[in-house]
C-alpha cells in the first residue's frame, strides 16, 4: 500500500515540475456540480493544484439550478434548439443564481478548504464584453464574447487568489448577457495564454464507436465533427477546444467531472482519463 502511494507521487512529479507557475482555466459544470462527492473532490483538486504552484482560474455554469429556480418562481424555462431563451425576467434569475448563489458557494468551499478564492462575474471590470448571439435565432439576452479584458484576473492571480468567474457578460449598452460557460472559459483561457483549458462534462471525453479517444489534434477533431462522430452537445465543446488550441492555449482536456478527482487523474498521470486536444508535436 505504501509503495503504491509513493509510485503515485513519483508519477505526478514530472507534471508538477512542468506545470509549476502555469495558468489552468477550468470550466466547472455538469455532474461535478450536482453530486456532492464529485463537488468536494473538485474543490480538493483545485486546492492541490494551487499548492503545487499551478494558477487555477475557474469558470462555472449552472443551467439546472437556473431552471430549478425559475420553476420555484412559477416560470417555465423555454428552450429553442437546446438553448435557453433569456428574456428580461429570465436574465435577472440567471444573474441571481449564477452570480449570487453558485459563485458564492464555490468561493466559500474553496476558502473553507484552505484556498483564497474571489468570486467575480464577466461584468466586473468589464472582464467579458458581450454582444447578442444571433446564430441560433433570437434567444433574447443570450450573448457571445466580443472581448475579454483580463487585467482583473492578472491582478488576482498575481496576488495569489483563485478567481471564480460567473459567465455573465456586459454589453456595450450596459445590459447583462447570459454566456455559455464553455465559450466563456475558452475565451478567458485565450486571453490569459493559459497552459491548459479543462472542460468538465458528463461523459468521459470524445468517443468514437464507444471508445475514448485519448489525444486529438485540432484537425482530427474537426474531421470528427464533419464525419458526424462528434454530435449534439459535444460539438460546441470540441469547437471551443479547437479554437482555444489554435489561439495559443497549450492543450484542452475534455473530462468526466462526475469521476472523483478527475482533474488530478487527467493532469498528473501518464494515461489520463479523458480526451486531450493539442497541436501535434511535429
Swiss-Prot record:
Matching HAMAP family: ArgB
Keyword ATP-binding: yes
GO molecular function ontology, one term from the record: ATP binding
Statement: the UniProt record of this protein carries the keyword Transferase: yes
Full protein name: Acetylglutamate kinase
Described function: Catalyzes the ATP-dependent phosphorylation of N-acetyl-L-glutamate.
Listed GO CC annotations: cytoplasm
GO BP terms in the entry: arginine biosynthetic process via ornithine; L-arginine biosynthetic process
Binding site for substrate: 62-63, 84, 178
Protein family according to the UniProt entry: Belongs to the acetylglutamate kinase family. ArgB subfamily.
Residues annotated as site: Transition state stabilizer: 27, 237
Compartments in which it is found: Cytoplasm
EC number: 2.7.2.8
Record keywords, A-Z: Amino-acid biosynthesis, Arginine biosynthesis, ATP-binding, Cytoplasm, Kinase, Nucleotide-binding, Transferase
Highest classification ranks of the organism: Bacteria, Thermotogati, Thermotogota, Thermotogae, Thermotogales
Catalysed reaction equations from the record: N-acetyl-L-glutamate + ATP = N-acetyl-L-glutamyl 5-phosphate + ADP
Pathway(s) the chain acts in: Amino-acid biosynthesis; L-arginine biosynthesis; N(2)-acetyl-L-ornithine from L-glutamate: step 2/4
The organism of origin for this protein: Thermotoga neapolitana (strain ATCC 49049 / DSM 4359 / NBRC 107923 / NS-E)
Pfam families: AA_kinase (PF00696)
Amino acid at each position: 500500500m505504501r509503495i503504491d502511494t509513493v509510485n503515485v507521487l513519483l508519477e505526478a512529479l514530472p507534471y508538477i515540475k512542468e506545470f509549476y507557475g502555469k495558468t489552468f482555466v477550468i470550466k466547472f459544470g455538469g455532474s461535478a456540480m450536482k453530486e456532492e462527492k464529485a463537488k468536494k473532490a473538485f474543490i480538493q483538486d483545485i486546492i492541490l493544484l494551487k499548492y503545487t504552484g499551478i494558477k487555477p482560474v475557474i469558470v462555472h455554469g449552472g443551467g439546472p439550478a437556473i431552471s430549478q429556480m425559475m420553476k420555484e418562481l412559477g416560470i417555465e424555462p423555454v428552450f429553442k434548439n437546446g438553448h435557453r431563451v433569456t428574456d428580461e425576467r429570465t436574465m435577472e434569475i440567471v444573474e441571481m443564481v449564477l452570480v449570487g448563489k453558485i459563485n458564492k458557494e464555490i468561493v466559500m468551499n474553496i476558502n473553507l478548504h484552505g484556498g483564497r478564492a474571489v468570486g467575480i462575474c464577466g461584468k466586473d471590470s468589464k472582464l467579458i464584453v458581450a454582444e447578442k448571439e444571433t446564430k441560433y435565432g433570437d434567444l433574447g439576452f443570450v450573448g457571445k464574447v466580443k472581448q475579454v479584458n483580463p487585467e482583473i484576473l492578472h491582478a488576482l492571480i498575481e496576488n495569489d487568489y483563485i478567481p471564480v468567474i460567473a459567465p455573465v457578460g456586459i454589453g456595450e449598452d450596459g445590459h447583462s448577457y447570459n454566456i455559455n460557460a464553455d465559450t466563456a472559459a475558452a475565451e478567458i483561457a485565450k486571453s490569459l495564454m493559459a497552459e491548459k483549458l479543462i472542460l468538465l462534462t458528463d461523459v468521459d471525453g470524445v468517443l468514437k464507436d464507444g471508445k475514448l479517444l485519448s489525444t486529438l489534434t485540432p484537425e482530427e477533431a474537426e474531421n470528427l465533427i464533419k464525419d458526424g462522430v462528434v454530435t449534439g452537445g459535444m460539438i460546441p465543446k470540441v469547437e471551443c477546444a479547437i479554437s482555444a488550441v489554435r489561439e495559443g492555449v497549450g492543450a484542452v482536456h475534455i473530462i468526466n467531472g462526475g469521476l472523483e478527482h478527475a482533474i488530478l487523474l487527467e493532469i498528473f498521470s501518464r494515461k489520463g482519463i479523458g480526451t486531450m486536444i493539442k497541436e501535434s508535436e511535429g
